[in-house]
Amino acid sequence: MGVCAGKYEKNRYRKPAISRKSYTKYIRMDGRFPGEKVQVDIKYVPDECIRFPSYGCRYYQITAIDEYSRKRTLEIVKEKSTYETTKFIKQLESRMGFRIKSIQVDNGAEFVNDGDRTSKESAFEKSSKSFEMQLRRTRPYSPWQNGKVERSHREDGKILYGRKVFTSEKELRKQVSKHEARYNNTAKTVLNFRSPNEIVEEYFLKCNKCLDS
């Protein structure tokens, strides 16, 4: 009886182990200089703001925010796709006005491919690599890890989309552009009552003085 029981224990069915994807430990990094870390995300433009024929199209706002200076770049697009986010990343450095060392995104399909389904890189991932930008991904279901861009989107909802309506696509783009400029030139408590543009200007002015001395 004991031998048979031992054989049974040895040969009985065992449930296969499930391989789970591991994620790197989250390390908070607020940025020590402009471009060290930039958070990127996308939000939809509320339908109630659109007062012109959109013919079934939805509008989205792609946002990049520099952790050090809080400078932002906004872009309105018609689809939530790697095609649009890749176009955005290609012009990001020229629009920000400085080199970007790393960018952080969530795990949305408009940015990255699901590593559990394919080993291929998305167009966005390839583009980031070609510009020598380190790509960091937040952990799943952890929007707080991209907290600065998430909070800025909430402010956009209150200040821009909660107060205005747009009678044409041209007007939408114009108002978003004005909103971006106003944000980047407005003094903020977190920046010791300086604007994002002032923070960037002061940083590179100090760098130039160090090089000259």
Which residues does each PLM region occupy?
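C-terminal domain-tail junction helix/linker
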Residues: 22-27, 36, 129-133, 154-213
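An active-site-proximal beta-strand-loop segment
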Residues: 35-73
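Acidic/histidine-rich, metal-coordinating catalytic segments
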Residues: 80, 98-116, 139-141, 146, ...
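Short small-residue beta-strand/loop micro-motif enriched in glycine and branched aliphatics
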Residues: 70-75, 136-138, 162
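RNase H-like polynucleotidyl transferase catalytic core
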Residues: 104-107, 124-147, 165-166
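Short, solvent-exposed loop/turn segments at secondary-structure boundaries
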Residues: 51, 76-77, 113-118
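Basic, flexible linker segments flanking DNA-binding modules
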Residues: 1-38, 42, 109, 119-126, ...
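Active-site beta-loop-alpha junctions of metal-dependent nucleic acid enzymes
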Residues: 57-58, 74-102
